[in-house]
Amino acid sequence: MRIAVYPGSFDPITNGHLDIIERAAELFDRLIVAIAKNPMKKPLFTLEERLDMLRETLKYYPNIEIDSFEGLTVNYLKAKNAQVIIRGLRAISDFENEFMMALTNKKLVPWVETIFLMTKAEYSFISSSAVKEVAMYGGCLKGLVPEYVELKLREKFQKEGC
């Protein structure tokens, strides 16, 4: 069985993430979308809220599992018997950091592969940070995030959208 892990903070999941997830799910028997708990980041949404948004957004994909983990991604892959890390790229500027992380992961666990997927051009400008800022100021989120996530952002900031 070909198993891949798509790790991220998903604070919140965007349509850019969803694009990568949908395409990766077609390439693997099982795709684990895993929230990486990063003590260096202060997320807007709690871990449970982010898991809920992922579960709701991805509930119709039979080969996708939702999970969370702490520690090194490569250790999580070993625990899940996964062979591949999926990483999404919005622009060439994302590549340098992602490439260095892929090399580090390969050094730690030589059999781990990293596959980079370019997001569709229509999503290349979307980031979780930008989405949170748009939501905070009551801007229109249509086309940026799944509907359920838009609802949760509106609740969090108590702002109306478009």
UniProtKB/Swiss-Prot annotation:
The keyword RNA-binding does not apply. One of its GO terms (biological process) is coenzyme A biosynthetic process. NCBIfam families: coaD_prev_kdtB, cyt_tran_rel. Pathway: Cofactor biosynthesis; coenzyme A biosynthesis; CoA from (R)-pantothenate: step 4/5. The gene is coaD. It comes from Carboxydothermus hydrogenoformans (strain ATCC BAA-161 / DSM 6008 / Z-2901). HAMAP family: PPAT_bact. Homohexamer. SUPFAM superfamilies: Nucleotidylyl transferase (SSF52374). ATP binds at S9, F10, H17, G88, L89, R90, E98, Y123, S124, F125, I126, S127, S128, S129. This is Phosphopantetheine adenylyltransferase. Its EC number is 2.7.7.3. Belongs to the bacterial CoaD family. It is an enzyme of class 2 (transferase). Its cofactor is Mg(2+).
